[in-house]
Amino acid sequence: MFGSAPAQADGCYTWTRTLSEGATGADVRQLQIRLSGYPGYGGVLALDSSFGPATRSALVRFQQAYGLAADGVAGSATYNKLYALQDDDCTPVNFTYAELNRCNSDWSGGKVSAATAKFNALVSMWKLQAMRHALGDQPITVTSGFRSIACNNAVGGASDSRHLYGDAVDLGAGPHSLCRLAQQARNHGFNGILGPGYPGHGDHTHVDHRSSRFWSASQCGI
């Protein structure tokens, strides 16, 4: 527990102990999900339930981003910030499942189970939340997320598009240019970044979590 500070109950998830390097368990994985947007340039944080050096580094970046004591230990101050950043369905406050799935209501029909597609979208939202904060807390426009095979075919998507796995998001221009979005995404755990200069991506920036890095947005210096 947190010593004299009482644990705060939260509608999505409540941590009941301080976490630091060496800890393992489901509560570590819940923390990692929310830190997945803070792996550092080109990094991807493993959601492996094990609090290792990479998790500590991601936590330090999160703490620094929000003006917390950057000690790499998750205690009440860190948890209170996370509680403030999440809604009761565990999505970050500035993104919704509905935004990430304009195809159907149940996440079915893709290349993975509905539960996996929905979870992948959740992780993407936490990455986008980190990216949004880094860009001055201005809105990020989501134009496409999960697609079933039928929805993907209807829009002419690639046959093995990451949208079919629920871990791809297309972003439109808004307060930030498409290039600014593509450039910033390099810091937030996306292995796939496609933007202006890549064929078919002149009107959006695509980010995803493919198995190995592929970044291509030549008009943006990527």
Please report, for each region that a protein language model flagged, where it lies by residue:
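Secretory targeting and sorting signals
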Residues: M1-A9
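Surface-exposed patches in mature extracellular/periplasmic domains of secreted proteins
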Residues: G42-D48, A70-A74, G136-F146, F190-Y198
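Active-site acidic/histidine clusters and adjacent loop/turn architecture
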Residues: D89-D137
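Second-shell loop/turn segments in exported
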Residues: W15-A23, V44-S49, G67-A70, G109-L122, ...
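Short acidic, glycine/serine/threonine-rich helix-capping segments at coil-helix boundaries
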Residues: L19-A84
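Intrinsically disordered, low-complexity Ser/Thr-rich linker and spacer segments
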Residues: C12-T16, K81-T96
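Active-site-adjacent substructure of cysteine-protease-like catalytic cores
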Residues: A134, Q138, T143-L164
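Catalytic cores and adjacent binding grooves of peptidoglycan-active enzymes
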Residues: N80, A158-I222
